[in-house]
Amino acid sequence: MDMVENADSLQAQERKDILMKYDKGHRAGLPEDKGPEPVGINSSIDRFGILHETELPPVTAREAKKIRREMTRTSKWMEMLGEWETYKHSSKLIDRVYKGIPMNIRGPVWSVLLNIQEIKLKNPGRYQIMKERGKRSSEHIHHIDLDVRTTLRNHVFFRDRYGAKQRELFYILLAYSEYNPEVGYCRDLSHITALFLLYLPEEDAFWALVQLLASERHSLPGFHSPNGGTVQGLQDQQEHVVPKSQPKTMWHQDKEGLCGQCASLGCLLRNLIDGISLGLTLRLWDVYLVEGEQVLMPITSIALKVQQKRLMKTSRCGLWARLRNQFFDTWAMNDDTVLKHLRASTKKLTRKQGDLPPPAKREQGSLAPRPVPASRGGKTLCKGYRQAPPGPPAQFQRPICSASPPWASRFSTPCPGGAVREDTYPVGTQGVPSLALAQGGPQGSWRFLEWKSMPRLPTDLDIGGPWFPHYDFEWSCWVRAISQEDQLATCWQAEHCGEVHNKDMSWPEEMSFTANSSKIDRQKVPTEKGATGLSNLGNTCFMNSSIQCVSNTQPLTQYFISGRHLYELNRTNPIGMKGHMAKCYGDLVQELWSGTQKSVAPLKLRRTIAKYAPKFDGFQQQDSQELLAFLLDGLHEDLNRVHEKPYVELKDSDGRPDWEVAAEAWDNHLRRNRSIIVDLFHGQLRSQVKCKTCGHISVRFDPFNFLSLPLPMDSYMDLEITVIKLDGTTPVRYGLRLNMDEKYTGLKKQLRDLCGLNSEQILLAEVHDSNIKNFPQDNQKVQLSVSGFLCAFEIPVPSSPISASSPTQIDFSSSPSTNGMFTLTTNGDLPKPIFIPNGMPNTVVPCGTEKNFTNGMVNGHMPSLPDSPFTGYIIAVHRKMMRTELYFLSPQENRPSLFGMPLIVPCTVHTRKKDLYDAVWIQVSWLARPLPPQEASIHAQDRDNCMGYQYPFTLRVVQKDGNSCAWCPQYRFCRGCKIDCGEDRAFIGNAYIAVDWHPTALHLRYQTSQERVVDKHESVEQSRRAQAEPINLDSCLRAFTSEEELGESEMYYCSKCKTHCLATKKLDLWRLPPFLIIHLKRFQFVNDQWIKSQKIVRFLRESFDPSAFLVPRDPALCQHKPLTPQGDELSKPRILAREVKKVDAQSSAGKEDMLLSKSPSSLSANISSSPKGSPSSSRKSGTSCPSSKNSSPNSSPRTLGRSKGRLRLPQIGSKNKPSSSKKNLDASKENGAGQICELADALSRGHMRGGSQPELVTPQDHEVALANGFLYEHEACGNGCGDGYSNGQLGNHSEEDSTDDQREDTHIKPIYNLYAISCHSGILSGGHYITYAKNPNCKWYCYNDSSCEELHPDEIDTDSAYILFYEQQGIDYAQFLPKIDGKKMADTSSTDEDSESDYEKYSMLQ
């Protein structure tokens, strides 16, 4: 155990070190550098950026002509890009691609070919999210790092270890491994991505890789998928074409027993990039992007033609090495000749396309076995192909790899492509290659599963063993014998050797075994009842987890094991499943609890679910909660005892008491829904909507079978934002907690309270690549997935309160200014001066608008102009000039590069140029290292005299991207016109300037480390701590029952106002079921995308009490009736058909066990204020209503209500109907308060066990009871309708249908114990479900698909809990089981036939 922990810690430390080095950048690789670059190194770099060992010769006249021709083609390509929609499908595009794409526009061409910009717009910020997620959780970090260091290391871009391009390559591959976990990372991806990075920015290169791997035309997924359909299809084509064009080469390869086509195709892309010159690689890559996979086979054919003489002279081992690693070496033709032959070969292949076999489907790979060479006399002859061995049945046919047994001689090892030497292994009688082992090993074919390293034998491979370690060529793997009866085809694929998964990622023999499981007498393995796993049928862990949780609900399992469901199947329910769901689930439960099997395959149930819910078909991962809801609803409808559902009118509360509305709603629910699912899982919610206009309240009561609780902390977003002020002080980072639907206006308000700036002074901006990319609007919702990081800049406060994000006009009322110091007021504090020199205006005026106005204003106002979108400020970006080694024109020798944090510089129509320099210097001076003391006076004198070099930078007018001039036309290649440091006004007519740092000052004085220095406000730590702290289940329930305001998009239609109005909504728990299911909503839809919350929720395993969240009941209604587990007051005598109806419109705020209130609004008063004979009791004292002499003082009202006949209610009280008037209502309460207890006493006297027979109830009695807020009716209908259970009809049911009392010895408060948990680990796009459940033997088990292991309760992973299953304490399971005496079992023969027929079809399809 310690070794495993040490290994894990070492691996985590290694991941951390790798990420730290890439984050640190080039400095992390300095120790590995080989010293300074030698003089004249530029003469060793060719025009493609490849560094050669020797100095390159001068450019020849032919090469110069080629370069000039390429420059001439640039204008034609620019025209084509301008009219791309016209040319993108034309033959002219293909012709020009074969002629060559100019280097300077290869990036834009690739961008339009792969449609990069469109997918970027559809996925803003997605790359950054994937990159950060990859840093946290990617399992490919080590392998990516190993490949990055060897990718294009002879190129100047990738030469520096942890340099800029290596970092970009590493992050792209890391992000893609999370974006597409199915592919993850493969070695070839590093070479492909490196090519993209030569001409595309980092994010564009990422989306280029995404588009390429998703393109059906390029078929790259087939090279990396487990089934290898692309490679198989190309091989099928080559086996028809190449032998005709290169017969000698193919004969030589067959003679050596080597499948050369396979090896070459398996390594095609890597050889195509590494094996030839970069110039030719780029041109072939251009063609591949346009033509797609159809050029791959002609490229291989040309390579075979070039290599023919060398291949014919090479033996087997050398032949394999050359085909694998040196396939494209030493092309004997120049680039233009290769492209010319390629074009001709492609056209020829296109004409003969009809003679080729159809390509294999990508998802299935090749279904036909690969032909093997004929055998004669024990030696291999390559004169043709014999008939292929018989394959498996079509429904089970999957390719596998062939290999030699571990004890076979080294010479007899097959080639890595999978072709077996038949001189060592003769052909069996069935025509299937068998391995006649020299040392007496078992006969049969062999297959192996590849690992690059030798791992521990996984548990997935314990089926069909034995397995042996096997070492061959470049890989190590596990090998096992397979009998000839399997009749499975062989797979030739070399690069992905291994037993190929099915489409659902299961192993071939598992599906074959599972599909025939119903006909095979499997060996019975004794096990604990219920400790049986469920086989994963292809990403079905979500289904297995839900089934195991429901299966461990003991009353429901006993119901199915005893076969009671067969007596209650409802095959006529139009919204049911004709009994199929209940029948299949019952069969599965009986297998799970038989105690004879370690695992069961739920094929029939899965087929039934897929039939009625196609969304669960296929092999995609689904939500276990959605499956659970569908399963419970399906079981309920198939077992519903109501065969003809009556029409029920949905009524509004109309001010009626909650108790009355709740009883009516529950009664209506039971009239249509009565099953064991209702008895066990159904509760009732109270939903209240209050109109904010008139105060009208509408209340509804709805049933539920599980509670979906939001995670309160995840209803907030945690955001860290850096505030940069104008005074040049160190930036400060603040931590904010915002609502998920918060807008940027609310963000500014919170930030205002923390940083001391007014909202008008805060400018929010998204900073990316050292430039401002976007300004969020105030009315937009805050988004966490932005393209960069969010910053807040201080801007000069305008003279009138306007929105900085969308200014319309500015008031030019004067504002005081003293000595050129511009003052800012912040939250009522004293005016704070910012350091702007003399000459600044008294009012804030947009820069660049002076020419449009007279005296600077029009009627005291000045509108913003399009050329100056900012009010009173401009944006400055830091810039340095980088020398470019490859360029065509002299102005392109230096290219600008942005760095650091952009600045906000105050600027108006009155600002002088010198003021701009001073304002910039104030904000950047803290980044510059101070001058030595002896130079300080000289520097100050230079600044005073405004002489040439007084500032370490120069200001220039630039475009928004910071690369080109805003004044000069593009053909001048101007990088930005200089702004002189003078006294004249800075009329720049533009919103962006560049701060060009002088190279010497940048090197000697600029402190790069200071860029990342920020002061952290205490709110940052508070936000992080709140985000990481676990929450408890009570917090989730509190959030669920809290009041929320309905927004403008979901306005409520008020029946009183007769219009849609703003309203508030509140949910409350009214009735809790005996078995409570709690769903933690970890998956939430935020900012137009689904995300998973990893928040840890703490919950109780024992004695969980949710009664605090039940709607408080009026104590007068509870004094004689203990609370049921559903939170209702109920006298156990079976006299309630629709529950005791509450009289008061507003529930009392008191608890259930409090003394009677003295308030006149209560149903009954206490002893001191009650009418004569009116009883009063307190549960604390144990007193109750006086009973008759015949009643036992120790008898419980729960023992009542077992008579067959109907009950007669005694004549009590007035017959007046309840009034909504408070006066009438109170009078009704006083008149009937004492009579209610008399009613209970009379019932107690007549319905105790052994008591007298009851009398009948008259209609007038109903009226009397209703007048007092109650309705009692006979409930001897089985499982207690009045209790919320529904095992019988209302009224007219005999004692045969009744069951034992279900609520014996229940507590006043509902106390629950945990008995099952469904947990989800991983992320939204890829995760896994497991279940922890408590067995009747009081032991906990972990159900992980087919595995089931006992564990200690402390070992349960509660951090990943997703669905909780609680059981109320003190429940007798037998009370929920209906009596079946005298009932007829439903005929399930037709159901079985339908299920078996569909099951066979489903199995064949698998």
Swiss-Prot record:
It comes from the Eukaryota. Its EC number is 3.4.19.12. Keywords: Calmodulin-binding, Cell membrane, Chromosomal rearrangement, Cytoplasm, Endosome, Hydrolase, Membrane, Protease, Proto-oncogene, Thiol protease, Ubl conjugation, Ubl conjugation pathway. Its main location: membrane. Residues 348-380, 1120-1231, 1384-1406 are annotated as: Disordered. One of its GO terms (biological process) is regulation of vesicle-mediated transport. The active site is at residues 541, 1328. Residues 1156-1197 have a biased composition (Low complexity). It catalyses: Thiol-dependent hydrolysis of ester, thioester, amide, peptide and isopeptide bonds formed by the C-terminal Gly of ubiquitin (a 76-residue protein attached to proteins as an intracellular targeting signal). It is found in: Cell membrane; Cytoplasm; Endosome. Testis specific. Expressed in various cancer cell lines. One of its GO terms (cellular component) is lysosome. Residues 532-1369 form the USP domain. Gene3D superfamilies: Cysteine proteinases, putative rabgap domain of human tbc1 domain family member 14 like domains, Ypt/Rab-GAP domain of gyp1p, domain 1, Ypt/Rab-GAP domain of gyp1p, domain 3. Residues 100-292 form the Rab-GAP TBC domain. One of its GO terms (molecular function) is nucleic acid binding. Pfam families: RabGAP-TBC, UCH. Residues 1129-1155 have a biased composition (Basic and acidic residues). SMART domains: TBC (SM00164). It is linked to A chromosomal aberration involving USP6 is a common genetic feature of aneurysmal bone cyst, a benign osseous neoplasm. Translocation t(16;17)(q22;p13) with CDH11. The translocation generates a fusion gene in which the strong CDH11 promoter is fused to the entire USP6 coding sequence, resulting in USP6 transcriptional up-regulation. The Rab-GAP TBC domain lacks GTPase activator activity but is necessary for interaction with ARF6. The USP6 gene only exists in the primate lineage. Belongs to the peptidase C19 family. Deubiquitinase with an ATP-independent isopeptidase activity, cleaving at the C-terminus of the ubiquitin moiety. Catalyzes its own deubiquitination. In vitro, isoform 2, but not isoform 3, shows deubiquitinating activity. Promotes plasma membrane localization of ARF6 and selectively regulates ARF6-dependent endocytic protein trafficking. Is able to initiate tumorigenesis by inducing the production of matrix metalloproteinases following NF-kappa-B activation. May act as a GTPase-activating protein for RAB3A. PANTHER family: UBIQUITIN CARBOXYL-TERMINAL HYDROLASE (PTHR21646), UBIQUITIN CARBOXYL-TERMINAL HYDROLASE 6 (PTHR21646:SF96). This is Ubiquitin carboxyl-terminal hydrolase 6. The gene is USP6.
